[in-house]
């Protein structure tokens, strides 16, 4: 998850990162 988050952060697409984590947690 952190790797994807990191890659998305580099693209400055934090929303996608947050959405990915949210989906993974099932919230």
UniProtKB/Swiss-Prot annotation:
Post-translational modification, as annotated: Contains disulfide bonds.
Temperature notes for this entry: Trypsin inhibitory activity is stable after incubation at 90 degrees Celsius for up to 2 hours.
Stated pH dependence: Trypsin inhibitory activity is stable after incubation at pH 2 to pH 10 at 60 degrees Celsius for 1 hour.
GO molecular-function term, one example from the UniProt record: serine-type endopeptidase inhibitor activity
Keywords: Antibiotic, Antimicrobial, Disulfide bond, Glycoprotein, Protease inhibitor, Serine protease inhibitor
Keyword Transcription: no
Assembly mode: Homodimer.
Other noteworthy facts: The monomer may consist of two smaller chains which are linked by at least one disulfide bond. On the 2D-gel the determined pI of this protein is: 6.6.
Name this protein carries in UniProt: Trypsin inhibitor 1
Organism in which the protein naturally occurs: Jatropha curcas (Barbados nut)
């Amino acid at each position: 998850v952190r790797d994807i988050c990191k890659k998305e952060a580099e693209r400055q697409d934090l929303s996608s990162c947050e959405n990915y984590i949210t989906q993974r947690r099932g919230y």
